[in-house]
Amino acid sequence: MMVFQSFILGNLVSLCMKIINSVVVVGLYYGFLTTFSIGPSYLFLLRARVMDEGEEGTEKKVSATTGFIAGQLMMFISIYYAPLHLALGRPHTITVLALPYLLFHFFWNNHKHFFDYGSTTRNEMRNLRIQCVFLNNLIFQLFNHFILPSSMLARLVNIYMFRCNNKMLFVTSSFVGWLIGHILFMKWVGLVLVWIQQNHSIRSNRSNVLIRSNKYKFLVSELRNSMARIFSILLFITCVYYLGRIPSPILTKKLKGTSETEERGGTKQDQEVSTEEAPFPSLFSEEREDLDQIDEIDEIRVNAKEQINKDDEFHIRTYYNYNKISENIDGNKENSNLEFLKIKKKEDSVLWFEKPLVTLIFDYKRWNRPNRYIKNDQIENAVRNEMSQYFFSACQSDGKDRISFSYPRNLSTFSEMIQKKIPSFRREKNPSDQFSTCWSLINEEKKENLKKEFLNRIEALDKEWSVEHILEKTTRFCHNETKKEYLPKIYDPFLHGISRGRTQRLFPFQIITKTYLKNPIGGSWINKIHGILLNINYQKFEQTIEKFNRKSSAIKKNLSFFSDPQEEKYKSEEESKIFKFLFDVVIADSNDQTLIKNFMDFHEIHKKVPRWSYKLRSDLEELEGENEETIPLEEPGIRARKAKRVVIFTDTEPHNEIYTNLKNNKNYDQNDEMVLIRYSQQSDFRREIIQGSMRPQRRKTVIWEFFQANMHSPLFFDRIDKFFFFSFDIRGLTKQILRNFMRKNEKKKLDKKDAERSKRKEKGRLKIAEVWDSFFFAQILRGFLLVTQSILRKYILLPLLIIIKNSVRMLLFQIPEWSEDLKDWKREMHVKCTYNRVPLSETEFPRNWLTDGIQIKILFPFYLKPWHKSKFHSSQKGRLKKTKDKGKKKDFCFLTVWGMETELPFGSAHKQPSFFGPISKELKKKMKKYKTKSFQVLRFFKERDKIFLKGAKEIKNWIMKNFVFIKGKRNDLSKGNRIPLLGLREIDELTETKNDSITSNPIIHELSVQNRSMEWKNSSFSENKIKNSIDRINTIRNQIEAISKEKKKITNSCNKPPYDSKIIESSKKKWQIVKSKNTRLIRKTFYFVKFCIEQLSLGIFGGIINIPRIITQLLFESTKQIRDKSIYKNEETQEKINKKKNTIYLISTIKKFKSNKKKISYDLCSLSQAYVFYKLSQLQVSNFSKLRAVLEYNICVTSLFVKNQIKDFFQEHGIFHYKLKEKTFLNSESNQWKNWLRSHYQYNLPEIVWARLVTEKWKNKINQDSLVLNQSLNKEDSYEKNQFDNYKKLNSFEADSLLNPKQNLKKDYIYNLFCYNSINSKETIFDMPLDIIIDNFLVSSFRGKSNIRGIGKFRTRKFLDWRILTFWFIKKVNIESAVDTTSKKKNIQTQAQNSERIHKITKTGLANQKKDFFDWMGMNEEILNYPIANFDFLFFPEFVLFSSTYKIKPWVIPIKLLLFNFNEKKTVNKKITRNQNVFIPSNETKNLRFYNLTKESADQGELESDNEKQRNPELALPNQEKNIEENYAESKIKKPENKKQYKPNTEVELDLFLTRYSRFQLRWNFFLNTKILNNIKIYCLLVRLKNPNEIAISSIERAEMNLDLLMIEKNFTFAKLMKKGILIIEPLRLSVKNDGQLIIYRTIGISLVHKNNHQISQREKKKIEKAITKYKKKTVNRKKKNSDFFAPENLLSPKRRREFRILICSKFKTKSTRYRNSRFDKNIQNCGQVLNQKKDLDKDKTNLMKLKFFLWPNFRLEDLACMNRYWFNTNNGNHFSMIRIHMYTRLKINS
């Protein structure tokens, strides 16, 4: 029951998965998604829903809905139907259909009778309104959707259309899905409208609110009535929107097209993508087909710069003589070619009227200009993007049509051409099932026939028949069976290898000289098939025949149609008939019976690629000036980013060597310019768009600001800075608040404010610059204004100010400063700069400065000063302040349009130092001094006033005392003479009481006296005192009554002094001072006026008297300067003489110091070394032995502390050794312990001593482990050289397979491991630290079995360190001779010697070798011993250990294909000279090496071809075999040739660098960009100046020029640059077009047999035959079933052998088996059986024998390609899944 339930659940899940993945469901899903792609058609649909009411309204709704659905149905049909898709997808559909209809509809809607919606009595079908509504919705639905664009949806639909089989079902289901979505959407819209109409609250409340005010009274009614107007406005917006998208045919400039060429023509101006074909492909040979299949990589030919005359167009095209009538085998004559020509003319005449209409309406080239231009780097013309990178075609495999991704391109092109020309060639497609059954039957029949044939041959072998009956013969092309006459082997399509001859080609950088074309060009054989297929012009062909007779030398290429034929005679008439059938002879020579070596070029089959018919160039190319030679000067067609050409430096004096080599070149420009391209800061809105072309809107870009730095999509809205209203990032806000709350340091806030302020300034500056850039004539206007402002400032304004200033000084009786001002004025320089601020010179204007712009930089700007300070009065404090502000001060500025000065162009004007500022400062100082003096006088008078007041006070006190005495006396008198009256007594009493009150309060009386005394002006204090005393008695008497009344009111407040008493006292003092000053001033005015008059007269007469004194002083100074210059020159010459005498200046200063008797304190801290060594130099040299030993062996110590001058001196005198000089150690920072070890010299043993210490056992182990590695070091890439040594060692592979069965079994295991482990290989980083000592590193790499040779330690580094590549495979030339001399000996000896030589490459030798510009890539030394697997085995590390094993049998794996290291050896023929226009630098010792194909090993096939040569010795070519053997010997003994060397040219070095090492990118380190650019700008100015010393010194003082970045060393290598951090080199993975096919090519290259490696020389073949015959004699008496013959399948030919393998391992009738590919998860039909490998092979001897018979180990890898092609029934490059086959099926023979 449980099983049943699980079964039901599994079925349900599978059923659900099938339903979900079905075509119908997916189509419904995609169709439902397209509902949301809202377009302008919804406007009319909603308009009909909203506005129309009544019967006519319902009819309009129905018509709108039907039109809408019909339009969408057309769109869905266009997905499936290609013509409709092309018609609707073109942008011109909008032009033709949309815009006129939209405009008509818009103006029709605005008609006055448009709103008349009354019912009509006409027939409904005749009602135009309903039809217009239908047409509106139909046409609008065809337009592109714009509110919610569905580009991604369309791509998904296209992808699924490609995948699914039932496409029509998918289209219909998607339409149904759209219909469902549309119905739901419209129902939702209808419900919303009904809800709005029925909802009373919305209608009443909102309307009441609006109606309350009179202003909005009729708004609702107006809105309801003007719905049609709103829709018409929306329609107008769509019209304007589409206006921007249409390609307007008006006002477009027609492009200048390239020359009209034929569809398959071959001129170099055609610039088509052509597939390079083999010279004569043998379509009948399967092996040849495999190689052709791989070799068909796109070779793109761009020869736009080589314009060829029309007379020389014959050299690529294949020609046919139409005048001569062809002759068939039957002898019938026909004029077939002329018939083809007539048919072609008829077709052209029929189509003449169709072309203008199509190009007018639906031209994809947009009348005159295309829609968009996508530039291809390798093709000058614009190839349209319909061209695919890879080629695939349908082919029949396993009886069914399948897509082959490696289909031969030329084969498909050839079949297309044949089908066009010959209608009968077209095949009718049979049903797939019928064809598959027929195919399986044919294969079964083939298999049975091959079985029988194979069994018969084995039986013949058992019966010991002759070899002719056993081995299969090679098929030959025979034309007479009775006479057994065959075609010559050169032309036999069934043959291959050496019998087909060789192809000679000229390599790059070479041309054909006159000696090469010495032989007359005779008759040529031309293929008749090419003549049938290609269109040939008679007149051109006749001209070519005449050129052959004139011995024309216009052939640029030497690709001959046939490959080096031998001179042979025709033997019979039948042979000539067959040749006449295949070929026609152009008789241009009397010797028509011979074949000449040199032939005319053949036509390569071309494929017409979709491309534009014109040639355009971009703005950038115009700025770079690359295409000036080829294209006439016209405006660039492609718009690029705004850029300007900045000329940094123009070299008017080129190098003499280069100039003499290039003087014959007419296009050579003597003014070599260094140019930078400066891009604008604004956004790139016009990238790669052709000028005048249409602008398809970019849906993904939105413009946010007026000046936007970078364009970006709204998808990145969350990453940009937004307003607070748009920002919803709460987490970021909280972070920012907390950060601001926690931040305590206010300095950071200030820095941030400064940075923000500088950013704002920079943005403002850029805005101004972009405004100047945006207008057309703005730069011209600005340039003229700047130049006029510069002239006005320099020559008018500043001299005028100087004159005014000095004249005013003369009027003020001061000394004029003419010389100082003129000196400062002359120092000011107006340097003309480029728009990018690169300074040129004062007189030189930048190129195109009116259009590109100009900047004027003012160096040492002149500021008018009221006076000049003397230099001697500057104090130490002033000096310190000056040095502190030196870096901040800038002695330059830029001129603005208004004549102001700015620090940067387009910046804000900074304030100039004012002229009156120092004057006001000086006046303030003088006023301060005057004030201090006046205050001193006042202080003196104040002290005097104090003394005077003190005396007056003492007088007052004396008077008061006297007054009290007199008063007492008077009282006494009054007491003595009393009058007896009552009144008087009472008065006395009152006076007594009053006196008591006066004594108690004396201050009041004094104040009253003081107040009264202030009123009295001209009276003294003493006189008033007496009067006051008398009057007081009277007043007291008068006031007795008042005092008695007020006595009660008196309080304690009367006792306090009043507040104003102190103020009155101070004012009194001031008044007295002022009064005294006035009197003094009146007295001294006369003397002051007299003093002023005297000073004026003295100033005038003093200035007149001082004029001759100033003149004499100037003369004295000029003579002193001249005298100082002469003294300085004498000192310089004396210094040069002293340098020649090798004197030490430090020691001479000590001598001067001793001789000088004056007591002057010198600082001898810097002279301590010199003093010590001076004392040592006075001693004898013999006493230096100990010191020399110490200093020599402690180099690390002495070189760091001893000065260079002292070391140079002692080195020249022989006192010290030269090693005392300073050394640059490798990585001294990280290797300090190594430097310490170097200082301990007793442990630094020489290499010979180290070699003795190594034990023999360890050495042998190293040599055994490094056997594989040293084979590659023996002779690089020479397959032939190793063959002899390997055959001598192993006695050939056949004998070895017979004699050493155990070793062969071990090899089989290695082969299996080689195949299976490559799948599970892990990626490893190719990296090695530079710090490891190379001797130990190499030894450890040889001892340990690392994955990649030369790698011991792995470090986590992201890029490949190129420095490690120079330590191993680059050797010196002195090692080369030793390797070449030992190459004659046995292989084992060379291995041992080479391994020792590897250990002898030391680190110091590499560090001290001479380095040049391209030394880091190894371009200066010849690569002698290049390891084979150095680069390609990075992908397959496990292949390294087995590479030598495969190299022993080079026919198994083509190492040249897999391990191609791009180092080909160049052998130069005597008859071929190098092109004189190309120079290779002297440092590069020709490591671009090309193989000479004539010296490769001859291609003879396998062992059967050798046996065939024994049977048919007349077929062999002994002369060629001798040449091959001689080439073997030459390649071994050959030494490098001394070639002519040229001096390096910068352009050639750059070209070599880019072509060979284009995968490396050089970039500056980011923090050095500004420094280096600033240095470059200063260099540009200094180069142009005659006396650059002053400006150089000032720029160094201002820290503008960095001396650390100066290239002081001449030979500055990349290693040092990288150490300093100036350059960083990172590998850049470029997407090269051929890379994908090269990877496939190399993957299959493992499994392909390279024919050059099949060749066995005659000597080795004899040895193999001897070994086989000896072994046969030994095994005669053995049983036949245990016969140990190496491989029975070798009885068959190679082609039949592979066919037999595949047929025997396949069952063609069973179709049920399936192979599931786990990598791509696809079900691929499989017809092969997979047998598991048995584990007990070693136990069972019979199984072992069967394995040896039928495993075929020497052809194991060859079968891998066949497995992919035949067993998996696919050709799609999934080459790693084929290694899943563990074992081949065994051959089952039924006895």
From Swiss-Prot:
Compositional bias, Basic and acidic residues, is annotated for 257-271
Q: Where in the cell is it found?
A: Plastid, Chloroplast inner membrane
What InterPro entries is this protein classified in? Answer: TIC214
Q: Which UniProt keywords apply?
A: Chloroplast, Membrane, Plastid, Plastid inner membrane, Protein transport, Transmembrane, Transmembrane helix, Transport
Q: Record keywords: Protein transport included?
A: yes
The answer to whether keyword Plastid applies is yes
The segments labelled Disordered in the record are 257-278, 1498-1521
Q: Which GO terms describe its biological process?
A: protein transport
Give an example GO cellular component term for this record.
chloroplast inner membrane
Q: How does it sit in the membrane?
A: Multi-pass membrane protein
Residue stretches spanning the membrane: 19-39, 68-88, 91-111, 133-153, 176-196, 230-250
Q: Name the job this protein performs.
A: Involved in protein precursor import into chloroplasts. May be part of an intermediate translocation complex acting as a protein-conducting channel at the inner envelope.
Any other comment in the entry?
There is a partial copy of the N-terminus (positions 1-367) of ycf1 in the inverted repeat (BAF49901).
Name the family the entry cites.
Belongs to the TIC214 family.
**PANTHER family recorded:** PROTEIN TIC 214, PROTEIN TIC 214-RELATED
Q: Quote the subunit structure annotation.
A: Part of the Tic complex.
Protein name per the record: Protein TIC 214
Source organism per entry reads Aethionema grandiflorum (Persian stone-cress)
Please state the gene responsible for encoding this protein.
TIC214
